[in-house]
Amino acid sequence: MSSYWRLWPIGTKPTRGSNHILYSNDQIGERIRLTTDLPISHFFQEESWTIISENKYLVLTYDAAFESAIAGTCEDFLHKTISYWQRWIKRCSIPNIYQTEVIRSALVLKLHQYEDTGAIIAASTTSLPEYPGSGRNWDYRYCWVRDSYYVLTALTHIGQFEEMESFANYIAGITHRNPGRLQPLYGILGNSELTEHILPYLKGYQESGPVRIGNQAFEHIQNDVYGQAMIALLPLFTDQRFKIHENKNVLGWVNFILEKIEATIEEKDAGIWEFRNFANHHCYSNLFQWVGCKAALLIARQNGYQDMEDRANVLLKRQKLTLKLVMTRSEKSIKTH
């Protein structure tokens, strides 16, 4: 909902139905319907009320009527949801040690992949404060290329590979639509414009604002993303259980990443800490560019791409020299201070 509830408290008209309440806002032409098997009169009372030993159901729909039998439909949805996750976790290779913790962690990671596109988001909500009152409340409901590598690695370690294939399609779609440099993060649909805004009319978690939507980091230059993208998808190109290496588009995608690494080896960036006000040379960025070249070398050798192998070798040598130079600068800076 694009208005983020800004206009709902003003001009919102609750309309009472037989088993629902319809909230309409004529200013923005939007409606929300709450359908329930509870007495509707309860919702118009100022007193609190308690349900004892009964299952009751509430369904919130956006501008649509809920026409099915509410109890049966909700129970059916619940059963199907539980069954889906039980089947998924049964397919995971999880040892007995810390099994409970690993299962819960795996479910959380899986829940953060948007099934329609393969995007993996860093958080399911926005603006939880890093520390109460600090003002460092950010919107992480986006797909960070860097973070996706670690999520996919964790999932493949427990035998889940479909997530990697879905993410590969997501990244391929982004690079096809936007042949320029890779951003550090994208929206779940691959959208690149993530302008940051503060919502002053929301108080935030435990009144520790501000509440932000969007993230300015989409404008940052973070050159480690090319290496991160390459190694995140490396198993797809080198593991014989996957067929992606037989796709002719693979060669073009890997060369695209190598081109970006070649163009940004000596470039300053915002680094892993996403500094908002200045750019510098960062060992981390150069290291992952080197890792990306090593991954390209493995892909080239396994699939017989001689031109790619030669190109990756040249970039590896250049990147090695650049990394040494950056580390030397860092050592001198530490001694100076």
Please provide the spans of the model-predicted regions.
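Acidic, mature catalytic/reactive cores of soluble proteins
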Residues: 1-337
